[in-house]
């Protein structure tokens, strides 16, 4: 059953420390288990820093990709374009190309721009490649993770401090959720996979590997840290009990196991922001997806890359879909360390200090404080308007933060 014994040992060594220090404490453990697995992989995919990607997309596949792209509705697209404010001759980086909705909107607003279209998903990369053939001087497709973005950009000839606007549309795309074979959705049965990179890295653990290999305490830690699941112990116990009879390999199989740990009345008792019933396993699926794809560490790496490649006055727009993502984005823009317990910005700390310390001590603290690196475009986070939610209910939990690099 344990297809990845090294994965199991490395988890016990790294993740327990990661959880103890806080789910968003990225300074304490900047590399999770996935880094260690990659170092001990004998069969690796094509290097993520290569500009080449999947094999050529043929006409029948092109039609399918085009249909997928048309079905996807980009989240808060008007607000995104407004915040990026594209101007003639500017350069943009879409770090989560997906099906290209936001990139298309940027080009519709201002055709005379260059967009580097990055995505870790080979399917999204294929769509970006297809679109780049229609707009060869406006779009260049890049295949890779956030942590590989710097090398990809340098290889493409993009120097630090030269990009005018960067977009990050975080989380799982509708395209991934709607493909049962990808294993992201509990509503459609498929293999319990959840790897955003697809088969590019064959030895990367799948969600099935996680639920079949880790012990109860480890599983509960993942559900609690990444799904903010208050019933983490109960769900982990149900998973352990079920897998002792048969391996857990399908999405709806896992959903049924989680549901079986609760009375029938509780399975759809939770409500989303639209007051619609949600399945009790939703947070479990979120937690596994975040863990499998190392999403929080990748997000932090992506934010650091964005800061490095944006020019002074360049704009960063980040769309997040749950509190863990939003907390990291907020702290990064406000200059708050990921190890801090409270979300106090540098400016707030200085103000707090001035109320408590003497004038001399305050002056000393002012002289050593870190400079602010971002100016927020909006004081408060933006959320979807009613029409946005009506057009795209999946984007109901979106939070948009935008800032200008100082």
UniProtKB/Swiss-Prot annotation:
S-adenosyl-L-methionine binds at residues 100-102, 119, 146, 169, 176. The modification Phosphoserine is found at residue 358. It comes from the Eukaryota. It holds the Pfam family Methyltransf_5. Keywords: Methyltransferase, Mitochondrion, Phosphoprotein, S-adenosyl-L-methionine, Transferase, Transit peptide. Residues 1-22 form a transit peptide. PANTHER family: 12S RRNA N4-METHYLCYTIDINE METHYLTRANSFERASE, S-ADENOSYL-METHYLTRANSFERASE MRAW. This is 12S rRNA N(4)-cytidine methyltransferase METTL15. It comes from Mus musculus (Mouse).
């Amino acid at each position: 059953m344990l297809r990845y014994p090294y994965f199991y040992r490395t988890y016990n060594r790294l993740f327990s420390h990661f959880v103890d220090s806080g789910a968003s404490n990225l300074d304490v453990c900047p590399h999770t288990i996935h880094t260690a697995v990659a170092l001990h992989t004998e069969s690796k995919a094509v290097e993520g820093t290569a500009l080449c990607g999947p094999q050529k997309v043929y006409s029948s596949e092109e039609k399918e990709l085009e249909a997928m792209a048309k079905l996807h509705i980009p989240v808060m697209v008007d607000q995104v374009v407004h915040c990026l404010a594209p101007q003639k001759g500017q350069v943009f980086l879409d770090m989560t190309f997906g099906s290209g909705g936001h990139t298309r909107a940027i080009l519709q607003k201002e055709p005379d721009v260059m967009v580097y279209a990055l995505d870790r998903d080979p399917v999204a990369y294929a769509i970006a490649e297809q679109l780049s053939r229609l707009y060869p001087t406006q779009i260049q497709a890049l295949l890779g993770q956030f942590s590989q973005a710097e090398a990809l950009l340098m290889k493409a000839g993009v120097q630090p401090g030269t990009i005018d606007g960067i977009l990050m549309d975080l989380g799982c795309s509708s395209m991934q959720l709607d493909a049962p074979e990808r294993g992201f959705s509990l509503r459609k049965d498929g293999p319990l996979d959840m790897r955003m990179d697809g088969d590019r890295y064959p030895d990367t653990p799948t969600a099935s590997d996680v639920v079949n290999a880790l012990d109860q305490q480890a599983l509960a830690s993942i559900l609690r840290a990444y799904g903010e699941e208050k019933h983490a112990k109960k769900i982990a116990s149900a998973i352990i009990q079920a897998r002792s009879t048969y391996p857990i390999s399908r999405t709806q199989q896992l959903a049924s196991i989680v549901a079986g740990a609760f009375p029938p009345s509780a399975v759809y008792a939770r409500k989303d922001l639209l007051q619609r019933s949600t399945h009790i396993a939703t947070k479990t699926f979120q937690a596994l997806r975040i863990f499998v794809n190392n999403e929080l560490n990748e997000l932090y790496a992506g934010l650091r890359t964005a800061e490095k490649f944006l020019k002074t006055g360049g704009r960063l727009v980040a769309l997040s879909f749950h509190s863990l993502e939003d907390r990291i984005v907020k702290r990064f823009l406000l200059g708050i360390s990921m190890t801090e317990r409270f979300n106090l910005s540098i400016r707030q700390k200085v103000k707090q200090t001035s109320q408590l310390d003497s004038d001399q001590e305050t002056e000393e603290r002012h002289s050593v404080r870190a400079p602010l690196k971002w100016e927020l475009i909006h004081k408060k986070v933006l959320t979807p308007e009613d029409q946005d939610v009506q057009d795209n209910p999946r984007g109901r939990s979106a939070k948009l933060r935008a800032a200008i690099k100082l």
